[in-house]
């Protein structure tokens, strides 16, 4: 049995008392919020608690990358929330539509553990709660809130809060740097394991071009960098072409699209009556599933906000996904470059 700190032990006792009170029945709430900074042991505590539950415990996260990280940390069969509680209406693998899966594995679970809970919006949160299964949600108060949506579980105060970073976790470069930032210390340029802190004038543009994901602070920088990276990759024109990387801007439950999800354009888009019709493959989907979408070209020219909502709501919304703002993408488990809105990619 691992040795827990007094803070962690108090959190374990609080969750155990909540479970003993039979959440969803009586006065115990259905949701327990276990929050803490990176490296404080949220996942470790969740795994330990799961071992003491008599019955099925399920682990899930908003993104596929986060679910994979949970698996690597020992959370067996961790999945995306979407795959856990929704099912395809038909067997058409090329274009399935989804609905709430009332008989899903979640329906008879004794506990569901949700990671990166700040990304869960009201609709997804209510669908999770509809199974009336106790929800242990894990969150990090240091994460920036999503620009839109999300925050369904983080609107309330934590039931237990972890602030002490483990000694082992302090050796992780990302955790170490995040601690310095929270303490108000300036980052010192240098190498921290596989992580580098560099000044703007010393940044190698090749590192930016080779990164899995580029993150910046402002939308104006995001648009400029997306244009440059597309140009450097040989993609001409203002509109998407086959091979382009896109990010979803609005949920579409029926198609299995979620705000912040990344996709790749698989075929040349077909413009029709000022509408782009595209076939996309979800970036984190290991199947051959294709999604047909209809998108206004204004999404890619920066003019989508000029359209009235009754016009916009009939279509899916995407933008180029090579560069995202830190609000849009907070999954640090990629090989990426986090920029400070400076010049990183040459003209």
Map each language-model feature to its residues.
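Post-Walker A helix-loop "phosphate-sensing" segment adjacent to the P-loop in P-loop NTPases
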Residues: 51-59
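Inter-Walker segment of RecA-like/P-loop motor cores
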Residues: 60-108
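C-terminal accessory regions
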Residues: 276-347
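Hydrophobic positions on the alpha1 helix immediately C-terminal to the Walker A/P-loop
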Residues: 45, 49
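Walker B catalytic acidic pair
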Residues: 115-116, 139
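Conserved helicase motor core of P-loop NTPases
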Residues: 11-40, 123-133, 138-299, 309
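Dynamic helix-loop-helix/coil hinge segments at AAA+ ATPase domain boundaries and subdomain interfaces
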Residues: 1-10
């Amino acid at each position: 049995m691992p040795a827990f700190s007094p803070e962690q032990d108090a959190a374990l006792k609080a969750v155990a008392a909540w479970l003993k009170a039979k959440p969803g029945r009586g006065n115990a709430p259905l949701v327990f919020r276990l929050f803490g900074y990176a490296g404080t042991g949220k996942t470790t505590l969740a795994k330990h608690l799961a071992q003491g539950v008599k019955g099925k415990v399920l682990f899930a996260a908003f993104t596929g990358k986060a679910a994979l990280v949970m698996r690597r940390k020992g959370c067996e069969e961790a999945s995306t929330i979407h795959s856990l509680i929704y099912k395809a209406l038909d067997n058409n693998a090329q274009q399935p539509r989804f609905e709430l899966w009332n008989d899903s594995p979640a329906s008879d679970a004794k506990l569901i553990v949700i990671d990166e809970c700040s990304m869960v919006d009201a609709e997804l949160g209510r669908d999770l709660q509809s199974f009336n299964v106790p929800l242990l949600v894990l969150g990090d108060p240091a994460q920036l809130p999503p620009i839109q949506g999300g925050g369904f579980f983080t609107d309330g105060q934590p039931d237990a809060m972890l602030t002490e970073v483990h000694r082992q976790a302090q050796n992780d470069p990302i955790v170490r740097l995040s601690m310095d930032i929270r303490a108000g210390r300036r980052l010192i340029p240098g190498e921290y394991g596989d992580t580098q802190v560099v000044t703007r004038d010393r940044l190698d543009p090749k590192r930016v071009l080779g990164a899995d994901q580029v993150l910046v602070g402002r939308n104006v920088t995001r648009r400029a960098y997306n244009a440059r990276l597309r140009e450097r990759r040989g993609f001409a024109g203002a509109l998407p072409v086959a091979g382009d990387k896109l990010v979803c801007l609005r949920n579409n439950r029926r198609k299995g699209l979620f705000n912040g999800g990344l996709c790749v354009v698989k075929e040349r888009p077909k413009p029709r009556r000022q509408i782009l019709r595209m076939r996309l493959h979800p970036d984190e989907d290991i199947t051959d599933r294709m999604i047909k979408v209809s998108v206004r070209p204004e999404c890619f020219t920066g003019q989508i906000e000029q359209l009235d909502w009754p016009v916009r709501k009939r279509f899916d919304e995407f933008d180029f996904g090579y560069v995202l703002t830190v609000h849009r993408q907070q999954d640090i488990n990629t090989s990426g470059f986090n920029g400070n809105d400076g010049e990183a990619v040459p003209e």
